[in-house]
Amino acid sequence: VAADAALLPFANAGETVLIVEDDPAVRVLVSAVLKELGYGFVEAGDANTAVPIIESDQRIDLMISDVGLPGMNGRQLAEIGRQIRPDLKVLFITGYAEHAAVRGGFLDPGMQLITKPFTFDLLTAKVREMIRA
């Protein structure tokens, strides 16, 4: 299976991911994975920084957001993002404690969730799957 995963196509030209994460170490890890896969990316340390990016003409094929952001949380950001860009795909990242708080109805269509700590392979698979969907 690992060999098959290596054969999956990398990013198409111009595909861009918005990373919204307040932990610089996680942001660096996610951006390194995206760079390795050939995706462009834009980073924001919190939701208030991300909103103007979402409102701009910046191409965004996927938003990866921590659920537990300072101020406005990732789910609230996704709601605003979808008001501006109705087809915005969102991959939430959450810690174990936060994952327990995620109830039914949290994820709308086009939204998925992975739990920290996550593997390079899981992040890679989710990003590819969601952008291709």
Regions found by a protein language model. Name each.
Residues E21:
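Conserved acidic carboxylate
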Residues D66:
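Active-site residues of response regulator receiver
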Residues E43-L62, R82:
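Acidic, metal-coordinating helix/loop segments flanking the phosphotransfer/catalytic sites
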Residues V28-E36:
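Charged docking surfaces used in two-component/phosphorelay signaling
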Residues E43, L69-M72, Q83-I84:
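Residue-level signal for the "D+5" position in two-component response regulator receiver
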Residues D46-T49, P70-L77:
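Acidic catalytic/metal-coordinating carboxylates
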Residues R75-Q76, I80-Q83, D87-T115, F120-E129:
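Alpha4 helix (beta4-alpha4-beta5 surface) of REC/receiver domains from two-component response regulators
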Residues V1-L18, G104:
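Disordered, acidic interdomain junction associated with two-component signaling
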